[in-house]
């Protein structure tokens, strides 16, 4: 089977979901191509889309929250939004790309390509199965104006929310958010720490801010370091934000208990090595930590879908969170000291996690294309 995965460079979460599906499909012998859809219109378009999104999220997050609220108000299955028509402009280019490469199925972990694919279906330009994958624990605006063959959603409890927004319930498959195989297995904590050159006999906090380095990370890290009185170590992964990385490295250059990391492909191993993770409530990072069974403290969300992610996790005792920085730090220390609370969260995570989403999505594509997987 020849699979096309369409994503967009608006943060690493969507790309991580796509890479998880790609990994699972290639493991089963399928041919997979994963691209940023907007590159079909040129690098300028791709950079403009990603630059605008990331710029708003990093520098004026309250405006992103406002846009999200407006989107929720105008989003409807009865009419098409400006977002739909903007993405529809790529119909012909995407149709030509799919036909020229003879793909058997297409899957997207991002709304924008789903809009384009839906327009193609309306114009009879799409003749292969198309599957969308939700990467947040809520139905974000404009999903209901798409028309995919199936929608993979993060959890069974979200079925009603998606259905009430206008997506046919028979198209909703609560398989989970796909994560790479490395997050579905565990390296022993001692072994992980040895490989990462971290101490074996002290508590370790892992602080993650996402690939964009979102949030008041420098302030948070400084306060956490001050509050660590029991020789705890802190590992800070600050994403692609090289400015924050430089600031933190300068701030903690004389503090051997603070380890500042930029973007890394060893997140899974760092999770294995830590005792508690502080993370912004992005759908992917939260799911990776959930699948890993690590006590989670959610930090300040990007207004919009991340606030919904926090609410979903807190309701099911999968994480703890607070809007106040000092309380967030306190909660992390409590999760280390209170073994009963720690164990309760781990039990809840084991009950709710869905580690096989990527494999099941590949199985769905095989069914839709009638691919024979027998030897």
Where are the model-predicted features located?
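Donor-nucleotide binding loops and adjacent catalytic segments primarily
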Residues: 199-274
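Acidic donor-binding loop of glycosyltransferase active sites
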Residues: 272-282
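Conserved N-terminal ligand/cofactor-binding loop architecture of enzyme catalytic domains
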Residues: 20-95
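A nucleotide-sugar donor-handling region in carbohydrate enzymes
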Residues: 149-204, 208-211
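C-terminal alpha-helical cap of glycosyltransferases
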Residues: 354-375
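Active-site and donor-binding regions of nucleotide-sugar-utilizing enzymes
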Residues: 12, 69-166, 171-174
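A short, well-ordered alpha-helix in the C-terminal region of glycosyltransferases
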Residues: 341-355
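C-terminal "capping" alpha-helix adjacent to the active site of nucleotide-linked donor transferases
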Residues: 314-340
